[in-house]
């Protein structure tokens, strides 16, 4: 039996909280196990001056950490699942997903502002194409300002730049004990969450049977079903670059209900859809919803977005 596990993690306060949380889950189920953190800085942490979509997308937060696993410098990696692309490097596996935290988006408005009370032409901070798309589809007058960094940095920059507020994930604020800054919780009907939002991803080497055995008690079956559907949707729509899409699944009994969205960043064209089916077909349901969205206009949106991305890169 293993007596020592090394967990690779980013150095942000939220990432460290998540890694320590997984460490605590492990030691509670395996008394005597020693856990140490391998703290790392990723490209996503270093390049904060440009929107994430302009510097390589969400995968920038995981590449160095995944390499540490492959090199044997760590045994486990803990990520936010929403930061992960649909395809993992060969040799790595999503070994466990603990129970999902609240997946909803929230608005943190200065002076108690909510999306309903934002003045005309208000400036709102977010680094997410998805959140920008959804907000602009509801409020075309709003001016989106790119605000990147860890949670505390984004909140500070929102205040420093005199923005009306910022859109963030409930889960991160809750984990950091910062719920008092929330002025409005946005239901999925208003702001459909990102694929994997609120879910911790525990990754390890595919051939590391001892680590995989340690992680079995941390797996939450219902969360796995939901993210299987969501990530199947993502895999069909991702297209190799960061795109404005959302996907959120819930499980009730033997049924999974998946909602999806693809839109232009400016919110002028948004395609929404949903599908229900048996949990045993979670992956197929994700692919089916992706096909439905593509047939109703998402393909055009994604092609246009890819062309713009390629033009910017050339």
From Swiss-Prot:
Q: Name one GO molecular function term.
A: hydroxymethylbilane synthase activity
PTM S-(dipyrrolylmethanemethyl)cysteine: list the residues: 241
- Classification via Gene3D superfamilies: Periplasmic binding protein-like II, Porphobilinogen deaminase, C-terminal domain
Q: Which EC numbers characterise this protein's activity in its record?
A: 2.5.1.61
Free-text comment on the cofactor: Binds 1 dipyrromethane group covalently.
Protein keywords: Porphyrin biosynthesis, Transferase
InterPro entries documented for this protein = HemC, Porphobilin_deaminase_cofac_BS, Porphobilin_deaminase_N, Porphobilinogen_deaminase_C, Porphobilinogen_deaminase_C_sf
Keyword Transferase present in the record's keywords: the answer is yes
GO cellular component labels: cytoplasm
Q: What family does this belong to?
A: Belongs to the HMBS family.
The record's note on quaternary structure and interaction partners says: Monomer.
- Extract the PANTHER family matched here: PORPHOBILINOGEN DEAMINASE (PTHR11557:SF0)
* Name this protein carries in UniProt: Porphobilinogen deaminase
Gene transcribed to yield this protein: hemC
């Amino acid at each position: 039996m293993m007596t020592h596990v090394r967990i690779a993690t980013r150095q942000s306060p939220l990432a460290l909280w998540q890694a320590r949380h997984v460490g605590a889950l492990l030691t509670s189920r395996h008394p005597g196990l020693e856990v140490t953190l391998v703290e790392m800085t990723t490209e996503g942490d270093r390049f904060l001056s440009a929107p994430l979509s302009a510097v390589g997308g969400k995968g920038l937060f995981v590449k160095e950490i995944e390499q540490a696993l492959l090199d044997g410098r760590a045994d486990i990696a803990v990520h936010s699942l929403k930061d992960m692309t649909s395809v993992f490097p060969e040799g790595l596996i999503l070994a466990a997903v603990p129970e999902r935290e609240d997946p909803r988006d929230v608005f943190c408005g200065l002076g108690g502002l909510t999306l309903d009370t934002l003045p005309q032409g208000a400036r709102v901070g977010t680094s997410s194409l998805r959140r920008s798309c959804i907000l602009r589809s509801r409020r075309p007058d709003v001016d989106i300002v790119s605000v990147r960094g860890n949670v505390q940095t984004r909140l500070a920059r929102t205040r420093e730049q005199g923005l009306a507020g910022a859109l963030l994930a409930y889960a991160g604020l809750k984990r950091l004990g910062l719920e008092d800054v929330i002025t409005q919780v946005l239901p999925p009907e208003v702001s459909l969450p990102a694929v994997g939002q609120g879910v911790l991803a525990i990754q390890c080497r595919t051939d590391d049977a001892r680590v995989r055995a340690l992680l079995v008690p941390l797996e939450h079956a219902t969360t796995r079903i939901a993210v299987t559907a969501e990530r199947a949707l993502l895999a069909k729509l991702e297209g190799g670059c960061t795109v404005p899409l959302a996907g959120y699944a819930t499980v009730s009994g033997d049924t999974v209900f998946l909602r999806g969205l693809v839109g232009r960043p400016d919110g002028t064209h948004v395609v929404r859809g949903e599908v229900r089916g048996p949990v045993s077909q979670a992956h197929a349901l994700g692919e089916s919803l992706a096909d439905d969205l593509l047939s109703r206009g998402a393909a055009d949106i994604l092609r246009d977005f890819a062309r713009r991305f390629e033009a910017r890169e050339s």
